[in-house]
Amino acid sequence: MSDCRAQIVTTYAGWTVLSALRSGAPVKSSSRVYPLLRSVDFHRLLAPSRARIMLGEFAEWHRDATRRLCARERALCVGWAAKMVNVYLKTAGYVGGLGRPGLAQLLHPPIDAGLWSGLKREFADRPELLAKTHVVTQIKAIRDYATYETIIAGCREAADDLGCLLIELEQLWEGADYGPQPNFSFQRAAPRVARLRR
């Protein structure tokens, strides 16, 4: 991948974070968001490398990046900081294809009302799963990393049930104005991933 393409992808990833923070976020201006993003060592994950990233390394990196954002900007709680990290990585790592081998399999979906709504609809018959994913239902209520990890643990179960990557739970995302339909698909709606029955 050319340096130019990587620059375009990461610049766009920063803009998607800024865009995702427009509604309800305690930090919304580019003069605050972009410096915060520059303080995160995304390069460690996104730089071309043959070294595969493993779950333990990613989990430690994610926890540290989230906590550092919170320490750097007092208005951020863990929920908003994690959303910033996750939106950036979704755009750069999953959509943009940047990153070390194995990164896409580890990425977390951005947690927000649209994802909570889609999870609730898709897993209405799984109260034990929803007890994890919906331990809180507002981003600002994710005040500590343990709560965030509980939500992600439930999301992992949901992804396993759907037979998809954790980040691919985004297929369930429901926009405020669009309801449970494909996310601005340019093609005919594809069937959702079939759920495995246990």
Per-region residue spans from a language model:
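C-terminal accessory module of base-excision DNA glycosylases/AP lyases that mediates lesion recognition
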Residues: M1-S19, G24-K28, E73-N86, K90-T91, ...
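Phosphate/adenylate-binding glycine loop and adjacent helical scaffold
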Residues: M1-A75
